[in-house]
Amino acid sequence: MEFSVKSGSPEKQRSACIVVGVFEPRRLSPIAEQLDKISDGYISALLRRGELEGKPGQTLLLHHVPNVLSERILLIGCGKERELDERQYKQVIQKTINTLNDTGSMEAVCFLTELHVKGRNNYWKVRQAVETAKETLYSFDQLKTNKSEPRRPLRKMVFNVPTRRELTSGERAIQHGLAIAAGIKAAKDLGNMPPNICNAAYLASQARQLADSYSKNVITRVIGEQQMRELGMNAYLAVGHGSQNESLMSVIEYKGNPSEDARPIVLVGKGLTFDSGGISIKPSEGMDEMKYDMCGAAAVYGVMRMVAELKLPINVIGVLAGCENMPGGRAYRPGDVLTTMSDQTVEVLNTDAEGRLVLCDVLTYVERFEPEAVIDVATLTGACVIALGHHITGLMSNHNPLAHELIGASEQAGDRAWRLPLGDEFQEQLESNFADMANIGGRPGGAITAGCFLSRFTRKYNWAHLDIAGTAWRSGKAKGATGRPVALLSQFLLNRAGFNGEE
C-alpha cells in the first residue's frame, strides 16, 4: 500500500474517495463543512434527516455528491470533538481503512489528520495513521492453502496536511511509520510462526537474512552451543538441554555512527521458541500459545529491521537468545545448581522460570560491548499479566533517566509501559540455602522478583527490563502476536537519534 502527503482544498481533489470526519451530534468537521458548502448543503441535509449522528465507528458513504470532483465521500463518525484522544483517533483510522477496503476503494484522500488530538501534532497523526493502516491490513496466511484477497484492495492513501510547510514533516512521518510498521509486521510474522518451523535455527536464519539485506550497516554472528560452553554460559545451555534443537544466540550489529567513541545501545530478546515448562511442565490447556515465548526476540528483530531501514545515526546491537525448553532425558531439573557466565550460582526451583536463566548469561555476555544502555525484552512472568493486564508492558530499571526515557517513548508511540519498583526487600525472596540465589522468589511480587534476579547480572551498565508477558500476543478469536513493544523501542531509538517528532 502506497502513502503520500499533499496540501490542498477538498474541492480540488479528484480521487476515488475523500474521507472526512463528523462529530456528535451531527457536527461537520471543518473540511466536511467546506464540502457541504461546495455541494450547496447536500451533506448537512443528509445529517438533518438522521443519516449519521457522528458516533464513533459510524460511517456513511456518499456517491456523486454535487459539485465535488471525487467519486465518493466517506463520512466517519468521530464522537465528541473535545473528547477525541489517541486511542479513539487510531480506532477512527482503523474503521476508515476497513470501510474503504470493504467498499472497493482503491485510493483515497484522507482529511482525518485535521482532527484535533490533544497534545499531538501533524507528524504524530500522519505516522500513527500509517502504522494503524498497516496494522489493520495485517494478516498471517503464509500457511493457509486458501488465501482470501479483498475484491479491490486499497492501494493508495493520500494524507492532506493544512499547509505546505508541513509537507516535509508529513513525508518524514510516512517514512518513519512505514519502517516501524514493517518492523512490527516482521515481529508478528516471527511470533505467529509455529514452533516446528520457528526454532532457534530459524531465528538465526532470519538474523542472517537481515544482514544480507542491509549488508552496508549490519553484521550478524551466530553463537552455537560449543562456543557457549567455552564462554561458560551454563544457565542458558541448561534450559535447552531437553530439546533436540540446538540453542543458538544470534547477535545482530548495526553501525550507524562511525565514531570510535560511540557506544552501542544493546537490545536483548528472550527467544524461547517453545516453552513446555520443562520438567516443571505446564498444563496442556493453552500450551500452544507457548510458541509466543520468543516474542521478545521477535520484537528485537523487528526493531533492528527498523533501525537498518531508516539508517539511524546510532549504533545498536540486537541479541536473539534462541532456545527451546522441553522435558527429556537430558533436561535440567528442579534442585540443580547452575554456575552462570558471571560465576554466580543459581538453584533451580522451577524449570518453568527458564527465561531469566537464558537472559542472565546473555546480560553478562553483552558487557563486552561496553554498552551505553541495555534493554532486555521478555515474555517473562504471568505475575506481570496479573499486575498490568494485557494493555501495559511492565518496566523495571536500575537507572532512573533510562526508565523515564522509555516511559516517555511509550507515551509518544502509544505502546504504553508502566514502571515497577526494584526494592532491596524483594531481593530477599531470592535467597537460597544451596546457591547464591534461587531462580524464583515465590508468588508475591513475581514480576518484580524476576526483575530483581536479572538486576544481579546488570551491575556494569545502565539497564532496563520490559516484561511483555501480557502484551506480546492476544488469545481467543483474535489470537496472534501483537508486535509489541516494537513501536516503543523504535520511538526510544528515534529519540536517541534526534528524531523526536516535535516539528
From Swiss-Prot:
Protein name per Swiss-Prot or TrEMBL: Probable cytosol aminopeptidase
HAMAP family from the UniProt entry: Cytosol_peptidase_M17
Entry keyword set: Aminopeptidase, Cytoplasm, Hydrolase, Manganese, Metal-binding, Protease
InterPro entries: Leucine_aapep/pepB, Macro_dom-like, Peptidase_M17_C, Peptidase_M17_leu_NH2_pept, Peptidase_M17_N
Gene symbol of the encoding locus: pepA
Domain of life: Bacteria
GO terms classed as biological process: proteolysis
Family recorded in the similarity comment: Belongs to the peptidase M17 family.
A Pfam family that the UniProt record links to this protein: Peptidase_M17_N
Catalytic activity: Release of an N-terminal amino acid, Xaa-|-Yaa-, in which Xaa is preferably Leu, but may be other amino acids including Pro although not Arg or Lys, and Yaa may be Pro. Amino acid amides and methyl esters are also readily hydrolyzed, but rates on arylamides are exceedingly low; Release of an N-terminal amino acid, preferentially leucine, but not glutamic or aspartic acids
Gene3D superfamilies membership: Leucine Aminopeptidase, subunit E, domain 1 (3.40.220.10), Zn peptidases (3.40.630.10)
Principal place of residence: cytoplasm
Residues annotated as catalytic: K282, R356
Cofactor(s), names only, from the UniProt record: Mn(2+)
Record-listed Mn(2+) 1 binding positions: D275, D352, E354
Subcellular location: Cytoplasm
This protein's record includes keyword Manganese: yes
Function in brief: Presumably involved in the processing and regular turnover of intracellular proteins. Catalyzes the removal of unsubstituted N-terminal amino acids from various peptides.
Molecular function GO labels: manganese ion binding; metalloaminopeptidase activity
CDD domains reported in the protein's UniProt record: Peptidase_M17 (cd00433)
Bound cofactor: record note: Binds 2 manganese ions per subunit.
Binding site for Mn(2+) 2: K270, D275, D293, E354
EC number: 3.4.11.1, 3.4.11.10
Recorded GO CC terms: cytoplasm
